[in-house]
Amino acid sequence: MNKLIAIASLAATMAVTGAAFSGETPAPEGASVYFINIKDGDTLTNPVTIQFGLKGMGVAPAGTEKEHTGHHHLIINESIEGEELNEPIPADDQHIHFGGGQTEKTLELPAGTHTLQLVLGDWSHIPHNPPVMSEKITVTVK
């Protein structure tokens, strides 16, 4: 009997611990994020201004745990997929966080071809379930 209680306790602890970073913040059906002012195939010049659109949810700063909200992340020349969707989005030059609730960014991109994608993160920078992600677009910077 003690063995059964120990196993049940361990399973419950694992379930609670795993839920903390499991990417389980729900996104409402039909929620979407998109680029407002650029599209796939565009040729751009520096400085590049990118505007972020969001439908079906609200924008809130990182750390604000409020239902149906999140904040933007701009993914440059990278992908977020598989198990990465259950983890906080990295913060580096390819994964730009807008934890203050920003909906626009002006930046310098090196000349050449780049892929861009928007991913909405929850209060703790983890993508929602299901993930709210734009289509990945390809742009050329002159």
Predicted feature residues:
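Short amphipathic, basic-aromatic surface patches that mediate peripheral association
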Residues: G53-T64, I126
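Short, well-structured beta-strand segments within conserved domains
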Residues: V48-F52, T103, G112-L120
